């Protein structure tokens, strides 16, 4: 098929050339002839975060970026030193894994900090610190979700483990196996019921939101790693560590903890 389509104008009977990647939309009738307008459907987002001129990971010194990183996808800064994305199938898999882990990390970062914030503002929890909360199940009263026994009351670690494995295992197995649910939808951005606010209605705005999601997701993954390290080194939650640092920045910082840390203490 040729790259241009011929459109007959009903206004003057003249022939005009229009790109074939445009979408035909009927808007009215004039003098018995159909009047049509065309809305261009862009093949790539017109955003500074996409394409060959997008920001690179080394700014103006990033000239020799891999040829397979073209800026087609969100979050592509041209950095792949290890060549992990050279194979298209591996690249697609890594993109999916990054988006999924980004979303889990953002939820995790919220779950690690929000209970501590609420606790410091008078909301009572059985245990607000994220890495200590699970141990409440071994207490005599068991584990109450949000400190309320009327919500979720758990007393068996084996039951929680079994439910977690069954539910998550089923969902992940279904996703990887490619069940019929969701056929024809983008596996990463399905839309529909998963977009109740219709944030993806505007393609340009949606392309920007994809970049923002990955930026925040990558930051959240680093944050979760930091929370793990804090828990091991200080034995405190992220909010308590923040308050300690603000109270005495010289004594409570990464350098002082790293130089004084003794494993097992």
Curated annotation (Swiss-Prot):
Residues 1-37 form a transit peptide. SUPFAM superfamilies: Chlorophyll a-b binding protein. Disruption phenotype: In plants silenced with microRNAs, functional LHCII thylakoid protein complexes where LHCB2 is replaced by LHCB1. However these LHCII complexes are impaired in light state transitions, leading to stunted growth in high light. Chlorophyll a 1 binds at residues 79, 85, 98, 218. Chlorophyll b 1 binds at residue 57. Chlorophyll b 3 binds at residues 156, 172. The modification Phosphothreonine is found at residue 40. Binds at least 14 chlorophylls (8 Chl-a and 6 Chl-b) and carotenoids such as lutein and neoxanthin. Chlorophyll a 6 binds at residues 245, 254. One of its GO terms (biological process) is cellular response to abscisic acid stimulus. It is found in: Plastid, Chloroplast thylakoid membrane. One of its GO terms (cellular component) is photosystem II. Belongs to the light-harvesting chlorophyll a/b-binding (LHC) protein family. The light-harvesting complex (LHC) functions as a light receptor, it captures and delivers excitation energy to photosystems with which it is closely associated. Mediates rapid phosphorylation and migration of LHCII-PSII to photosystem I (PSI) after transition to state 2 (red) light conditions, thus leading to the formation of PSI-PSII-LHCII and PSI-LHCII supercomplex to balance the relative excitation of PSI and PSII. Involved in the production of reactive oxygen species (ROS) and stomatal closure upon abscisic acid (ABA) treatment. Required to prevent water loss. This is Chlorophyll a-b binding protein 2.1, chloroplastic.
